[in-house]
Amino acid sequence: MDELAGGGGGGQGMAAPPRPQQGPGGNLSLPPGANGAPGGGGPPAAEAAGPPAGPELSRPQQYTIPGILHYIQHEWARFEMERAHWEVERAELQARIAFLQGERKGQENLKKDLVRRIKMLEYALKQERAKYHKLKYGTELNQGDLKMPTFESEETKDVEAPPAPQNSQLTWKQGRQLLRQYLQEVGYTDTILDVRSQRVRSLLGLSNSEPNGSVEAKNLEQILNGGESPKQKGQEIKRPPGDVLETFNFLENADDSDEEENDMIEGIPEGKDKLRIHKHKIGNEGLAADLTDDPDTEEALKEFDFLVTAEDGEGAGEARSSGDGTEWDKDDLSPTAEVWDVDQGLISKLKEQYKKERKGKKGVKRVNRTNLCDMITDLGDDELPHIPSGIINQSRSASTRMADHEGARAEEAEPITFPSGGGKSFIMGSDDVLLSVLGLGDLADLTVTNDADYSYDLPANKDAFRKTWNPKYTLRSHFDGVRALAFHPVEPVLVTASEDHTLKLWNLQKTVPAKKSASLDVEPIYTFRAHIGPVLSLAISSNGEQCFSGGIDATIQWWNMPSPNVDPYDTYESNVLAGTLVAHTDAVWGLAYSGIKNQLLSCSADGTIRLWNPQEKLPCVCTYNGDKEHGIPTSVDFIGCDPAHMVTSFNTGSAVIYDLETSQSLVMLSSQVDSGLQSSNHINRVVSHPTLPVTITAHEDRHIKFFDNKTGKMIHSMVAHLDAVTSLAVDPNGIYLMSGSHDCSIRLWNLDSKTCVQEITAHRKKLDESIYDVAFHPSKAYIASAGADALAKVFV
């Protein structure tokens, strides 16, 4: 027990046990659980507190096995609980890491896919340019070796990519010489390369605004590795547009004259050329050293490989050089500048060659700087940031540069296009410019469309504004063939006359969706009932307040038009039927109304044509062809350009123009056919042109013929349909003619060229008959057809 008691002393270091208390009678009472009681939570104390009160206090406290086991179990349970919490947190963090890694992988795949798309678009653009150049100039465009872009898989890239050597200056030199050779083949000179290199460096944020112009290796490494702090990135993005434009130093000497590039070249001293070359050396050397030290930097720069490999140059090869737009002192130059081994004589020779090329550019006018500023201002002051006027005056539109180069070198090589980011800063803002440059850059402005292609489409689009008619409404309530129809002069209202002895009024704005068709069904709002037999003809007054119908019962019914908003289930109104015109003795086949004198013309199978004034007590004013000298009339119409005359067609194949005042026939319109063929030359419909002295007739022999009202001679004849032409209508402007036929088709004709511009299959045949009537709306974009299938259709 002494060993146990002594060994238990080590337990005091783990937890402080409660002190024993002195109970009644001077004995110490242990806390619960000290002797194995159920409530014990820790080992008993080994020392007593207070003065000794009896012989038992001198003995040290003893531990019990149950108490120790209970303590161990308690601590083990607490440890397991903490471990479970830790496992849960660990699993959550692992899931978060996996999610972020998946997102990163997806973004990388998306980036690679976009780069591949860009390369394919570049390839397609070059092919289109070569094809256009060959079509325009008849010669092949020299673009070097035009090859399909190749894409290596990620596994191959990881395996085959060797680590960058420590001394890679030689590799940089060889690559630069090869790239310069490619650019010279495309037509790029060293001066343009210098300008574009400064441009790319500025857009990539590699410029430095320090006074001495030195680039520290640490700052360069931070820029390449994206190691700026979030605060620095925020400040960079929030720069005003003016600061962004000030970095485009190659625009400072821009001039309005046509010799801008020429003056710029002449104004560059030879010393500055050398200085610019030395700047490229320093930037490239520092960049190469950083690439060998940091593999992440090399991987980041590979994202811009598509800029380097573009065959048209685009100046992206200069993206490897870093520096700012300010001139550096010669004392600051690195002695490693000889790495590039630049031939000064070659540069001078190329500059002279470039000057000569710019001589032929004088005829090209550029956008005036003032006009450019006005155009930028017109884009909206509320949407654009404030830009100092000096910066605007120093800037040049990239599109004008592209136009100048295209005008000067169109016959020689591909047009040289400068980066378009300079103009973007006015419209997009500095942060958008930064994002666009670091994203797709100049490739975002690529297009396969040539400006000259728009002119090719002009002849093809000559009739682009011509309306194409499509079926919209189907009128289904008649029980037999619809013989005639007419539109209200102003409202979207239609009246139809049918062989079921009725006329129906339709409001096209009150529609019901059809069950199995894209068109809309319209229910009639009123039904006119007075005829004893089929209704054959129809006419509406010019004000739309009266309607006239002629039927097989030899009567002409005169109707007052109900309101377009009438309730279909209202009680019968007797005042709708205004009267009946009785004079004919056989079926009335044609009606025509003139709003000038409010007169009505009718032609009947009894051989007569009658002129009516419905308002008079004796409505029949005059009768024509009483002796049937010309045959049986089939159709009648007022002359559009001379309402004092009318034209009537006959079943003999001729048409006659009458003077309404004298009742005499003035002109006989005949196509001079033999009498034996007149039976097949039956005229079904005659209409007069609304503005020209021309009469148009529809014949049973599938022809449509045009006659001169003054001479009576036929001026044109054409086979218009596959079956008999039954109906004609001329639009209110006199531009188009619509014809209907028993071949189930409606055809729209251009009256100027006499050509069919649209054909619509509208109705089905019934007893070898199909379309009875067609009509234009006088003031709205509606046309309609009436058919033997008991349907009327409206097209819009």
Swiss-Prot record:
Keyword Methyltransferase: no
PROSITE patterns: WD_REPEATS_1, WD_REPEATS_2, WD_REPEATS_REGION
GO biological process per UniProt: negative regulation of DNA-templated transcription; negative regulation of hippo signaling; negative regulation of intracellular estrogen receptor signaling pathway; response to estradiol
GO cellular component: dendrite; FAR/SIN/STRIPAK complex; Golgi apparatus; neuronal cell body; nucleoplasm; plasma membrane; postsynapse
Record field: compositional bias (Gly residues): 1-13
Phosphoserine: residues bearing it: S202, S214, S229, S257, S334
Key words, A-Z: Acetylation, Calmodulin-binding, Coiled coil, Cytoplasm, Membrane, Phosphoprotein, Repeat, WD repeat
Annotated stretches, region: Caveolin-binding: 71-79
Biased composition (Acidic residues): 253-264
Pfam family, one: WD40
Region (Disordered): 1-60, 252-271, 311-335
GO MF term set: armadillo repeat domain binding; calmodulin binding; protein phosphatase 2A binding; protein-containing complex binding; protein-macromolecule adaptor activity; small GTPase binding
Tissue: Mainly expressed in the brain and muscles but is also detected at low levels in various tissues such as kidney, spleen and lung.
Residue ranges of coiled coil: 77-136
Placement of WD repeats on the sequence: 477-516, 530-569, 583-622, 678-717, 720-759, 766-795
Top-level taxonomic group: Eukaryota
Location of the region described as Calmodulin-binding in the Swiss-Prot/TrEMBL record: 166-183
Keyword Transferase: no
N-acetylmethionine modified-residue sites: M1
Residues where Phosphothreonine is found: T150
Subunit-level organization: Tetramerizes. Part of the core of STRIPAK complexes composed of PP2A catalytic and scaffolding subunits, the striatins (PP2A regulatory subunits), the striatin-associated proteins MOB4, STRIP1 and STRIP2, PDCD10 and members of the STE20 kinases, such as STK24 and STK26. The STRIPAK complex can be extended by adapter proteins such as SLMAP:SIKE1 or CTTNBP2NL. Interacts with CDC42BPB.
UniProt record similarity statement: Belongs to the WD repeat striatin family.
The protein's name in its UniProt record: Striatin-3
Organism this protein belongs to: Mus musculus (Mouse)
Lineage start: Eukaryota, Metazoa, Chordata, Craniata, Vertebrata
